Curated annotation (Swiss-Prot):
GO terms for cellular component: plasma membrane. Residues 293-310 have a biased composition (Basic and acidic residues). GO terms for molecular function: metalloendopeptidase activity; zinc ion binding. CDD domains: M48B_HtpX_like (cd07336). Zn(2+) binds at residues 131, 135, 207. GO terms for biological process: proteolysis. It is found in: Cell inner membrane. The gene is htpX. Its cofactor is Zn(2+). It holds the Pfam family Peptidase_M48. Keywords: Cell inner membrane, Cell membrane, Hydrolase, Membrane, Metal-binding, Metalloprotease, Protease, Transmembrane, Transmembrane helix, Zinc. This is Protease HtpX homolog. Belongs to the peptidase M48B family. It comes from Desulfatibacillum aliphaticivorans.
Length: 310
């Protein structure tokens, strides 16, 4: 119920924001355009935003005959979580990453990249998939897909502000825009930052919650902790062709290494996430090397984690 209220609040806030920006850019004509745009975006956000995101990344649905191990892990973890079996998609990119989308647990999708399947062992893959199913269980997925669509709308308005500054606003008359030429250029610069802030308002805490819930679904935190360590090591080496508006949907930031993306990161630090899973203190020199931990330390860390959940 809490996340349903958040979804309504997000839709309301974004509608108001689009109307204000439209009015500032193009006066009455701009506000009318923004109103039409907001109504359309609200409708499509609920019914089609998941399909748009999947199409954006050219993700392909797979069945047990095409990806038996992947499908089997998702099936087992879904049963552990008490969730309906989601659809399973593979993204044709070598950068290791994953996300979940959909409007509710009955219409959920889990998508992983080819790079993730190549990089992770079975336990680590289960940890990643459990994290994504945790987003489904916690009903984060609708908020995430709405935020992606709305952030894209803000980016579109930024582009309109830029061209409006060049050609004189929506109606071709400088008087239509309360901002004027300089103001519209400023809007074109600030709107992408606004898009990043929208993603951040989804709250980084949902990643911590998904990590904890995912560890419970998987049965232990070790697989996810090791997977996050690997993702941290490889995310900078293999760039992902990702849209900034969807960055918050992935298990790790797909825009790693880009200074502006880091400044407005939609994810908490990986070393902190790993530390919470393992019960260790985050290392100041970087993410703990999870795969290099001894078996005894891993068992002790897992015990600390489960004790903290009691």
């Amino acid at each position: 119920m809490g996340n349903q209220i958040k979804s309504v609040m997000l839709l309301t806030a974004m509608t108001a924001f689009l109307l204000i920006v439209g009015q500032l850019i193009g006066g009455r004509a701009g506000m009318t355009f923004a109103l039409i745009m907001a109504v359309g975006m609200n409708f499509f956000s609920y019914w089609y935003s998941d399909k748009i995101v999947l199409k954006m990344y050219r993700a392909k649905e797979v069945n047990p005959g095409q990806a038996l191990e992947l499908y089997g892990i998702v099936q087992r973890l879904s049963s552990n979580a008490g969730l309906p079996m989601p659809k399973v998609y593979i993204i044709p990119q070598q950068a290791p990453n994953a996300f979940a989308t959909g409007r509710n647990p009955d219409h959920a999708v889990v998508a992983v990249t080819e790079g993730l399947l190549n990089l992770m062992n079975r336990e680590e893959l289960a940890g990643v998939l459990a994290h994504e199913l945790a987003h489904v269980k916690n009903r984060d997925i609708l908020i995430g897909t709405i935020a992606a669509t709305m952030a894209g709308a803000v980016m579109f308005l930024a582009s309109m502000a830029k061209w409006g500054a060049i050609f004189g606003g929506f109606g071709g008359n400088d008087d239509d825009s309360p901002l004027g030429f300089a103001g519209m250029l400023i809007m074109a610069i600030l709107a992408p930052i606004g898009a990043a802030l929208i993603q951040m308002t989804i709250s980084r805490t949902r990643e911590y919650q998904a990590d904890a819930t995912g560890a419970q679904i998987a049965g232990n935190p070790k697989g996810l902790a090791n997977a996050l360590a690997k993702l941290g090591a490889y995310s900078g080496r293999i760039p992902m062709d990702a849209e900034p508006a969807t960055a918050h949907m992935f298990i790790v930031n797909p825009l790693s290494g880009k200074s502006l993306a880091t400044l407005f990161s939609t994810h908490p630090p990986l070393e902190e996430r790993i530390a919470r899973l393992t019960g260790a203190r985050p290392q100041s020199g970087g993410a703990p090397s999870g795969p290099e931990r001894t078996a005894r330390n891993a068992e002790d860390s897992a015990k600390d984690f489960w004790d903290s959940l009691k």
